[in-house]
Amino acid sequence: MATSLIPMRSHQYKMPGGRRTGTAATAYTVGMMRVEIPTNEPLPAGPLEDYRKLDDTALASRIDEVRQRLGSRVLILGHHYQQDGVIAHADLRGDSYQLSKSAAERTDCEAIVFCGVHFMAETADILVNRPEQIAGRNGSRVNVVLPDTAAGCSMADMAAIEQVEDAWADLGEIIDTDDITPVTYINSAASLKAFCGRHGGIVCTSSNARAVLEWAFARTKRVLFFPDQHLGRNTANSMGVPLEQMCVWNPHDPRLGGNDATTLEKSRVILWQGHCSVHAMFRPEHVDTMRENLPGVKILVHPECAMEVVEKSDLAGSTSYIINQIEAAAPGTSWAIGTELHLVRRLEQEHPEQNIRFLSPTVCMCATMYRIDLAHLCWSLEHLESGNPVNVICVDQDTAHWSVVALERMLDVTAFKQG
């Protein structure tokens, strides 16, 4: 008889407010490109020590064996930015929301291992363990496991719930907050999604950000957009919102986020001072250099890049958009892509009929995503099999409820636009 993956007890972790999201980096050269590979800090002697002694071939073999024994009871989700050795074991590959949504539609799994970062595992837990779904499983929760709880997101960490609540209170001294819609990028903590749910706000993805802002502006005069200023600015700019009607809120400046009352009153979009550390590495001069060296190249970037980069590019869109553009392009098309290196290199390998380049000559890959390695994946799977899961991400009921409210508003907006 198969062992149930629903444990008598489990080790549940909450990421501390000051969680560490950076690691040391080792530089090496791939062709003409200098690459900085984040290096996991040495682990103290502990549960992973024996796994660290194994090479990748041995780890992959053990992962395959435990997967075969667990069968459909466990679902492995792999984000596009994962390293190839990890993504090879994923049942589903995609962006953060796409993976969580797909997982919520599965009815046969007892546990999910999310090879991504902390906020992604939170979103999966929220969507997979909604009350009606738990009821449909006779009260059983699906454990969502993050192989390494140190896999956070520096951008998500740039907007703590306490900072957002303080900003909201400060804005209320100048502007009627009933006339502000809070919008959080899905790349954020569950507490921020819940904040938006409570305050009439909404979640967005990089795919539907424009539709979400259109919805928000139909309801209120202003938007507070967090945590990624670049996605907010690029989206608002594409909608024709003048730059002088956008301001940046610095959560570390106690003086109205570094603004005065007049600036806030004339602003339609209040952008949180946050950014993706990977996409911030791409610079306008990278676009110029690529066009000089490769005439006819198409520049394709993610909207988390700075506006100056997006405006110089030919195309900008979400991870799924980038993949779809490459898949639909004619053989022989030349591309320079500005997004996370693992994805770009994978596209290059999967589409040898096209000439795909990485936009930047030097980049640091997503350090925290890189923490999910074969050792952590094997360790977490074998603990699931033993009935003693580790690193279970569990969002509290109230936060999950209000997060779902904000997420469902997003789904309604997207469905209306597509209908």
Question: What are the roles of these predicted feature ranges?
Answer:
Residues 2-337, 343-419:
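Active-site loop-to-helix "anion-binding N-cap" substructures in soluble metabolic enzymes
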